[in-house]
Amino acid sequence: MKIGFLGCGAMGSIYAGNLTKAHEVYIFDAMPAVCEAVNTTGITIDEPDGSTKVYHPVIATTDPSTIGEMDIMIVFVKYLFLESALEKCKTMIGPHTIVLSLQNGIGNYDEIAKVVPEKQICCGTTAHGATNLGPGHSRHTGVGPTNVGTIKGGHESAEKVAEALRAGGFE
């Protein structure tokens, strides 16, 4: 499955990295330093057990027009930048792309719905935690369940996302 990420900070890195175990992962990040680090050395994650893992997505770019449509797009960008990031990433979101928000805060769904049809939107919560240690480097600080659902779409979208997450090692 082709999975895109909107933002590759602390949490985006945890999810993007782990999902490379089972999927093609593509990253859009507005920060060139993040893209350069991920493309050069991969995503480095310091795990809670003390181990360090490195994952290699297909590409990290500041130009999403080079990527194409995704099966799933996972949003981790800060709310303040959400609208402009979604506008830039329209080429990654096709008529069958499921857009999942795992962002903190409220109001994300409404912002996403300005750009994406509501039937394509999933929202979720996660008990995972992370700290950003630098471009492409995160410390995984907490592990737990990730819950996904839809507001207007059918449960099939949420099931597809949950399957993709499980394949990457998330519960």
Predicted regions and their residues:
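NAD(P)+-binding Rossmann beta1-loop-alpha1 motif at the extreme N-terminus of oxidoreductases
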Residues: M1-P48
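Nucleotide donor/acceptor-binding cores
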Residues: M1, D71, G144
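Internal alpha-helical scaffold of NAD(P)-dependent oxidoreductase catalytic cores
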Residues: M92, V115-Q120, L133-E171
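Short, charged/polar "capping" segments at the starts of alpha-helices
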Residues: V34-A37, Y109-D110, E156
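Rossmann-like NAD(P)(H) cofactor-binding subdomain of soluble oxidoreductases
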Residues: K53-H56, T61-H137
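Conserved beta-strand segments of alpha/beta enzyme cores
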Residues: E24, T44, I59, Q120-C122, ...
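Residues at the C-termini of beta-strands that transition into short coil/loop
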Residues: D29, D49, T62-P64, Q103, ...
